């Protein structure tokens, strides 16, 4: 391998133009001096994915054109596989998620600060949340909200009175939590009438607001399509997004005993290529971030050996500590007119109620999230079909469903490299219910949520009827052990992930604790960061897309304010023949002569 060709280098290379990576790319190039290359597996599908309807979003997420849908191993505790979904478009999962806007609680981020440093405390990152958003709703605490940011957040439209108010009142009483107007103020325990969504008003309706629309729009980069997928910065911005690329690995050069990240090897149009970074490489590949590190030789040696990868850096936590938010489902019979009121008020996002509550430990954030829909979405489909519970507006009553989420499960899984082939999917084990505490938590919250429905029925006996899944009679069993045994079976039957993932490159204070430090630098390297939800020591305690965007913004803050973590010493004068990589003879270089004002 000869000298690095100067036309094939950028200041930074970002792997992934997703929820966090797209933000980093935009913000780093705002000075029109810093040059950034982004390597993205997907293409721009902003127009195709603009629909604000939650059902459409859930359907789109199953399409492999814009999403990776990777089956897990057979999960022993539930007897079936789960599907790990992640974005495969510019904008990442912010382009096909359900659009719920949830920051997470002050307590959660203060726990991050306790674990890895005050730069992650809620007081340190509040300004990032505010700068990220344009909030168009009502709040009890205006100082907590932003009103001039790139991501639009709206409140749900609801009827003046009805089932939403009934369920929220019952939730407040039974779970002993307050009803608030706005849950995105750092508050931990609460219930609320109006959920919030990342959507912008347009033509008397709404469109999705995402990293793509807010940070990588036509004012920032040219807009690619299926036939011309790459995107270039406009108006002198030094940004290039290479779409339809698959990253193989990161290239390193050893300097004074430290592995310095200097380039990225990737595949585009069936050809292996290499590009170089003068200042740093940022991995923002979501579920695949740990896999890219492993393919680059960073990980636990026994994990790497199984895929035929030689160990460059023994980093035992890479691919471990994988977390998701799991839920058990409940179904309740409700008078149809009450459900139609909610469906009519906000057809795109007809949520019935929501709630958050703390975990058992005295420190840390929430563990419980409740989410209600006017359809049996959270009930196992086989039970819906067997009992004829599909929503039918002509019937006098229908089945609403409640997701009883564990947003800080004790069980942890893995995302591990399965093959040295960069096109191969990883081996994913979500490991649900591996810790029996999670099963007991779900059973306890089943019972508590049932008690909430009993209270709601007292408040509205003509509209709230019986619990049908699990059957109401189970909750009334006099034998406590029998009740819990039967409820455990319903937990296992309905237990599913909520497509919220992270933790497999978690932050820690040492390489024994984590994969990256509190400033996102990969232990054992220089000039290499990871910046996405995979760095979360504990997942944000709610729908985590907003948290992922905050991580991207904080990464930019670190890069700008802690440049000492990034500057590569003496690289320009060094010979690249001793890079820590496979022989790259025959690799094709990218001609960046058409890159607008590239350095």
Predicted regions and their residues:
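Extreme N-terminal leader/targeting segments of oxidoreductases
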Residues: 1-11, 558-568
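N-terminal glycine-rich phosphate/pyrophosphate-binding loop and immediately adjacent elements
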Residues: 2-130, 310-317, 324-334
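Glycine-rich loop(s) and the adjacent beta-strand/alpha-helix scaffold that form part
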Residues: 23, 27, 31-37, 42-47, ...
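Conserved redox-cofactor binding core of oxidoreductases
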Residues: 113-249, 253, 261, 469-470
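Mid-to-C-terminal "cap/lid" subdomains and adjacent gly/pro-rich loops that border
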Residues: 156, 236-238, 291, 300-408, ...
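A glycine-rich dinucleotide-binding beta-alpha-beta segment and adjacent secondary-structure elements
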Residues: 243, 248-251, 459-539
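A conserved FAD-binding loop/helix module that cradles the flavin
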Residues: 538-557
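Long, intrinsically disordered low-complexity tandem-repeat segments
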Residues: 571-597
């Amino acid at each position: 391998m000869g000298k690095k060709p100067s036309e094939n280098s950028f200041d930074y290379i970002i792997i992934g133009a997703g929820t966090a990576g797209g933000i980093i790319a935009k913000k780093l190039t705002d000075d029109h001096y810093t040059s950034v290359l982004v390597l993205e597996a997907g293409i721009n599908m902003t127009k195709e994915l603009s629909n604000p309807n939650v059902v459409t979003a859930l359907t789109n997420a199953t399409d492999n054109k814009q999403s990776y849908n990777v089956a897990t191993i057979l999960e022993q505790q539930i007897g079936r596989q789960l599907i790990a979904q992640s974005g495969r478009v510019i904008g990442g999962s912010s382009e096909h998620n359900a659009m719920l806007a949830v920051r997470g609680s002050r307590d959660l981020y203060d726990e991050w600060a306790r674990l890895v440093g005050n730069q992650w405390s809620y007081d340190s990152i509040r300004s990032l949340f505010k700068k990220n958003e344009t909030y168009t709703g009502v709040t009890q605490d205006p100082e907590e909200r932003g009103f001039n940011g790139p991501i639009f957040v709206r409140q749900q439209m609801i009827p003046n009175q009805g089932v939403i108010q009934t369920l929220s009142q019952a939730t407040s009483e039974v779970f002993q939590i307050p009803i608030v107007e706005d849950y995105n103020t750092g508050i931990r325990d609460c219930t609320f009438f109006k959920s919030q969504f990342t959507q912008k008003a347009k033509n008397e309706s709404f469109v999705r607001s995402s990293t793509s629309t807010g940070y990588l729009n036509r004012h920032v980069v040219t807009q690619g399509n299926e036939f011309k997928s790459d995107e270039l910065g406009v108006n002198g911005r030094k940004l290039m997004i290479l779409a339809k690329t698959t990253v193989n690995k990161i290239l390193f050069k050893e300097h004074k005993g430290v592995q310095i990240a200097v380039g990225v090897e990737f595949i585009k149009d069936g050809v292996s290529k290499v590009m170089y970074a003068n200042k740093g490489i940022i991995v923002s590949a979501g579920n695949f971030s740990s896999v890219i590190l492993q393919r680059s030789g960073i990980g636990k040696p026994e994990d790497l050996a199984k895929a035929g990868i030689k160990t460059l850096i023994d980093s035992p936590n890479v691919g471990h500590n994988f977390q998701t938010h799991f839920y058990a489902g409940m179904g309740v019979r409700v008078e149809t007119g009450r459900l139609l009121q909610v469906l009519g008020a906000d057809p795109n996002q007809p949520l019935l109620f929501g709630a958050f509550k703390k975990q058992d430990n005295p420190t840390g954030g929430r563990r419980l999230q409740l989410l209600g829909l006017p359809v049996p979405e959270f009930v196992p489909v086989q039970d819906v079909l067997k009992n004829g519970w599909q929503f039918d507006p002509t019937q006098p009553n229908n089945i609403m469903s409640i997701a009883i989420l564990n947003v800080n499960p004790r069980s942890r899984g893995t995302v591990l490299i399965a093959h040295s082939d960069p096109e191969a999917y990883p081996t994913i084990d979500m490991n649900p219910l591996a810790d029996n505490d999670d099963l007991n938590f779900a059973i306890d919250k089943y019972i508590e949520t049932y008690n909430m429905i009993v209270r709601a029925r007292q408040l509205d006996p003509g509209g709230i009827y019986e619990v049908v899944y699990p059957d109401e009679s189970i909750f009334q069993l006099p034998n406590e052990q029998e009740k819990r045994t039967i409820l455990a079976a319903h937990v296992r039957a309905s237990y599913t992930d909520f497509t919220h993932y992270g933790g497999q490159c978690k932050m820690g204070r040492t390489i024994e604790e984590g994969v990256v430090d509190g400033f996102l630098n990969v232990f054992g390297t220089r000039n290499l960061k990871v910046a996405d939800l995979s760095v979360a020591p504990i997942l944000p305690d709610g729908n985590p897309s907003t948290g992922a965007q905050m991580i991207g913004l904080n990464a930019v803050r670190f890069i700008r304010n802690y440049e000492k973590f990034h500057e590569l010493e003496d690289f320009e004068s060094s010979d690249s023949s001793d890079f820590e990589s496979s022989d790259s003879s025959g690799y094709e270089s990218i001609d960046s002569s058409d890159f607008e004002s590239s350095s």
